[in-house]
Design a protein with these regions (language model features):
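A short, surface-exposed beta-strand/turn
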Residues: 67-92
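Short, non-transmembrane alpha-helical segments in secretory-pathway proteins
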Residues: 23-48, 96-106, 157-158
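Sec-dependent N-terminal signal peptides of Gram-positive bacterial secreted proteins and lipoproteins
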Residues: 3-25
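Extracytoplasmic electrostatic interaction patches
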Residues: 90-227
């Protein structure tokens, strides 16, 4: 009886090992296919890949490890057919996105700092997709910081919404008015520090979908000084 139990446990262990190995190879194969798709589409190499979701892989651009791209095998046409998609196209247009954003922001603020983050939302757009089509998807978030006084903040917001809407840039803008000393220290790596510790005079989120929207302002409590 004891030997029989030992054999059963051994068989179970072998089965578990086999299943784990099979899953590992399935995952590796999926990642390999995702990297191959990106190589063929963009003629660029990607690596440091890992599973982000069941049907999605996160990977970085080999020549710029700071850029992480999401690649997904999904039903983009809602017809039951799956194909590869990604969000790297937005990174290729980053300079243009920044330029168009700055054109709007500069009409409102004398001093500003702008940081653009591409959201983890994929598409199957071809390489020659017009920038306006990318804008209409709205799958990016723009962080805007200024040291301007908050007295005209509501009018400032109206101008930003109008300017972005005119460019069909249907995105999310996280706008913050900072103290002059904090504005000087502000950098992209301090975004979470500012928002998490209330290091702002006033802050709001703008969702560029229409010209009319109410701004809900938050006022900072300055739990700490910006380092």
């Amino acid at each position: 009886m004891k030997k029989k139990r030992t054999y059963i446990l051994l068989i179970v262990a072998l089965l578990i090992s086999f299943i784990c190995t099979a899953c590992m190879w399935t995952e590796e194969g999926f990642i390999e296919e995702a990297e191959k798709y990106m190589k063929n589409k963009y003629n660029d190499s990607f690596g440091s890949s890992f599973m982000y979701d069941r049907d999605a892989v996160m990977m970085s651009l080999n020549k710029n490890q700071k850029i992480y791209v999401l690649v997904e095998y999904g039903d983009f046409k809602d017809n039951g057919t799956k194909e590869w998609g990604d969000n790297y196209l937005y990174y290729l247009h980053m300079d243009e996105i920044y330029k168009d954003t700055k054109e709007v922001i500069d009409t409102v603020y004398e001093n500003s700092k702008i940081y653009i983050h591409i959201n983890n939302i994929t598409n199957n757009f071809p390489l020659d997709t017009d920038i306006v089509e990318l804008y209409k998807r709205g799958t990016f978030t723009i962080y805007v910081y200024t040291d301007k006084d908050i007295v005209d903040k509501d009018n400032d917001v109206l101008k930003i919404i109008q300017g972005m809407y005119d460019k069909s840039m249907y995105c999310t803008i996280r706008l913050s008015y900072l103290r002059e000393s904090d504005f000087t220290k502000m950098s992209e790596d301090k975004i979470n520090e500012v928002s998490g510790n209330g290091i702002y005079n006033a802050s709001t989120n703008l969702y560029i979908r229409s010209r009319e929207q109410d701004s809900k302002w938050r006022y900072g409590d300055f739990k700490k000084d910006l380092e």
